[in-house]
Regions:
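Sec-dependent signal peptide recognition
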Residues: 1-9
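C-terminal motif of bacterial Sec signal peptides marking the signal peptidase cleavage site
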Residues: 14-16
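Bacterial signal peptide processing site
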Residues: 18-20
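Coil residues (strongly favoring Ser/Thr
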Residues: 33, 39, 72-73
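N-terminal post-signal-peptidase region of extra-cytosolic proteins
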Residues: 38-53, 80-97, 118-125, 152, ...
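Exported/periplasmic cell-wall-interacting domains
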Residues: 43, 100-102, 115-206
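Glycine-rich catalytic cores of cysteine/serine-nucleophile enzymes that process amide/ester linkages
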Residues: 58-104
């Protein structure tokens, strides 16, 4: 984790030009609907790439795993995602928005939990159903709680798209690969706002 922080700090300094003012709007504490459980499966720290971080793009509805390689940053893999059904920064509980952050103050994965038996009632007449895939990657999102990256059991058709209550949904198979090959506790996650442009290292992919 210390190595990643050093590398990510260097990346931020290198690509910080043109970011504009930080989002200063007030953020109310919010808890999205996530089943609370005492059953936590420890994450076996195998195949961890501590020089990797995640970028989630609201405009593109994609999750990218990126790696700092020397003075460069490269994309390793990308996955389609489903995000909050409403646009903009999250303001309060139940507003159906996904929070975004800055490169200077990114989110962090605080734990990776076995969510294979988690259920949720979406209020659509289906009742309480399995909804999270095998894993829930909980994010530290200051001002909010209950936000994470998870699967899309019984909602696979929503990916890619905008249909969640604020979390980031992946196809279950993609989530499993992300967990096994890249994700780890302490991993940096940047969620980009709808209007945010591209960093220099991102421009080479377009």
């Amino acid at each position: 984790m210390n190595l990643l922080l050093v590398l990510f700090s260097a990346l931020t300094l290198l690509f910080s030009c043109g970011n504009g003012d930080k989002n200063k709007e007030k953020q109310a504490v919010a808890t999205d609907s996530v089943m609370v459980t005492d059953s936590v499966t420890p994450y076996a720290e195998m195949q961890v790439k501590e020089n990797c971080f995640i970028v989630i793009s609201k405009p593109e509805l994609k999750l990218y795993v990126c790696e700092v390689v020397g003075t460069d940053t490269v994309r390793l893999v990308e996955y389609p995602v489903c995000m909050g059904r409403n646009l903009g920064q999250k303001q309060k509980k139940g507003d159906m928005r996904t929070p975004h952050c800055t490169w200077e103050e990114p989110f962090v994965i605080t734990e990776i939990v076995n969510a294979s038996n988690w259920s949720h009632d979406f209020g659509d007449g289906r009742g309480s159903i399995l909804a999270y895939g095998n894993w829930f990657m909980r994010l530290k999102t200051p001002g909010f709680s209950g936000i994470g990256i998870h699967g899309s059991t019984n909602n696979e058709e929503s990916v890619p798209g905008r249909a969640s209550e604020g979390c980031i949904r992946l196809h279950n198979d993609d989530l499993d690969i992300l967990k096994e090959q890249y994700a780890y506790k302490g991993m940096v996650v940047v969620i980009k706002a709808e209007e945010e442009g591209l960093k220099p290292f991102e421009q080479k992919y377009y």
